[in-house]
Amino acid sequence: MSAPSPSLLAAARDMAGQQHYPQGALYMVATPIGNLADIGLRALHVLDLVDCIACEDTRHTAALLQSYGLHKPLLALHEHNEAEAAQTVVQRLREGQRVAYVSDAGTPGVSDPGARLCAAVHAAGLRALPLPGASSITALLSVAGTGGHDGGFVFTGFLSPKTTERQREVQAIAADPRACVLLEAPHRIEALARDLAALGERPLTIGRELTKQFEEVAQVAARDFPAWLQAGAHRTRGEFVLLVHPATAAIDDNMDEATLRTLDLLLAELPVKTAVKLCAEISGAPRNALYQAALARRKGAQED
């Protein structure tokens, strides 16, 4: 991508400049996850406005800025020096500087460095402000066909690189009726696929290299994920975001009336999760089945 024309940067300043950007504040700026055209106008404005940009990788960020015709002093802040570098940022903020933080791609602080930086800024009584933008998490959710509206979703990020611990984490996903979003790197994707195959028929939406030239979005049963990877040599390359769809545990038609009555009484007064938890403790019924029953009863009540 060639650098944006001066008129585009001027338009970004005109549109985004209508908002106040206080001095002495940290700006957490989302950057593209692949396609450079996904940069936000406010992101361009703030990256041009700030006194300094802290970043996960100075070489990567320098190249990114050059793509947009921007040049700023850079400060390395990554997982290995975040605590120390955060204090440097805090000092700059105390001096009244505006500082931006960007990770290598996407929204900083979400499975990327930046969270400890924000914690240090808040602890110092200073401001941290978000500039939302690209995120592989919401990108995949938007095309998965299950936005978590029927029970929410959980984001687990990267699972453990250790086999036993990762398999234990997959078991926890299996027991959770909600949708689950996770990330994985290319060198570990085959091992993760083998473990996720234990989820059997549970649907899985795969996002590979999202927004890039060779992006792929596919849906398979979890048990078929290893075979999907092996169907093309290119499929083990690139960054992955995965969505394990909500469990579809069958509701036991023979669940006793007393349990269902208890569930109804709890649902009348409490949120679904709390009602299900208490009903499971009272009745001993499986939480998965109770959760599905609760969702069905709430949906039926809304339609009546």
Role assignments for model-derived ranges:
Residues V46-I53, G125-L129, R178-C180:
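Short active-site oxyanion
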Residues R116-D176:
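Class I SAM-dependent methyltransferase SAM-binding "motif I" and its flanking Rossmann-like core
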Residues Q18, Q87-R94, L229-A231:
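Short amphipathic alpha-helix with an adjacent loop that forms part of the alpha/beta core around
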Residues A3-L8, M15, Q23, R98, ...:
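A contiguous loop/helix-start segment that scaffolds small-molecule binding in enzyme catalytic cores
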Residues R94-A139, H187-A191:
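A glycine-rich beta-strand to alpha-helix segment
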Residues E79-L93, P113:
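Short phosphate-binding loop-to-helix
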Residues A76-A83, L159-T163:
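Conserved helicase motor
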Residues S2-H80:
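Glycine-rich, flexible N-terminal cofactor/catalytic loop recognition
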